[in-house]
Amino acid sequence: MQRLAHVDVTVTDLDLATAYYTEVIGMLETERDENSVYLKCWDEPNHHSLRLIYGPRVGFDLMSFKVDRDDDLEEFERRVLNYGFPVRRVSKGERVGQGESIQFETPSGQVMELVADLEMVGRATSPVNPVPFVEGLPGIAPPRLDHLL
């Protein structure tokens, strides 16, 4: 596993949660559909690192980790199955901003996901001589999700 890819959080007020994550935290909205808002930090190249999902309760639902390549998914699937946990395969295109993945549930009820292919949408800075911080962003404006948690 390389790093944290993204997390899914269920919220009861999608507009209020989106305002908090964009205005207070300083994340950038990359996409929205009827029940979800996708957000990322300014120094992240991928489509999103946080997905807010409208639902009847508040909760942390999924944590996704990036693996090197698709072949790794088969190896991790085998390992998870050997520990006795069922694995769900997710097809490319089933989840916004990513390719094929595997999902499994932890004993405490959270869904863990492993994914190899993530959609790249670019950073807010140039890859050549990037500035260390982008001026004028609202809120805290962390560079990456792993600097936010």
Locate the predicted segments by residue.
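N-terminal beta-strand motif that seeds the catalytic metal site of vicinal oxygen chelate
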Residues: 1-15, 45, 60-65, 126-149
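Core segments of cupin and vicinal oxygen chelate
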Residues: 2, 8-46
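Residues at or immediately preceding the N-termini of alpha-helices
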Residues: 14, 70-73
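Alpha-helical elements of the RecA-like P-loop NTPase motor core of helicases
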Residues: 18, 74, 112
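Conserved short beta-strand elements that form part of the metal-binding/catalytic scaffold
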Residues: 28-61, 111-118
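DNA polymerase sliding clamps and clamp-related checkpoint/processivity subunits
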Residues: 49-59, 63-68, 75-81, 88-91
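Vicinal oxygen chelate
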Residues: 77, 81-144
